Amino acid sequence: MEDNSPNIHTYGALPFYQIHFVVKGNGKMFEELLLARTRKRVKGVIKKSVEDVWWEGGKIAERLNSDSRLKHLLISILKDDDDIFIDPVENAVRIYTRFKIESDLTRHLSKEAIEAYNIIAGHVKSIMKEFE
């Protein structure tokens, strides 16, 4: 007996990924301080270039905005990326981007991108230690 249902869905691995960096700690305790995301000003329609990058959110946004090395890295890595988010959860703080196509993995995990995520994680850790 054949199943000719129009509602058949295929499941399985999809060719998308999401980059997550995790800082362990009581993230919920610092929710107001650590919730943040990047914003950017882009120039051009077809050949886009990032002119400026800044952070919006809690106390951490002030620190991240004052880090000139991080800003330089973000301008170069966010030209192809969406925003970066900092999200405190129950027992950690997640630093992540939106879902990406699997074929772009090496471009989104460049040396500069990993350095930027490490700088962000360092700022997260320092705020968590400061306000414990």
What are these regions (language model features)?
Residues 1-7:
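Short N-terminal edge-element motif at the start of the domain
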Residues 10-16, 22-132:
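Charged, low-complexity intrinsically disordered regions
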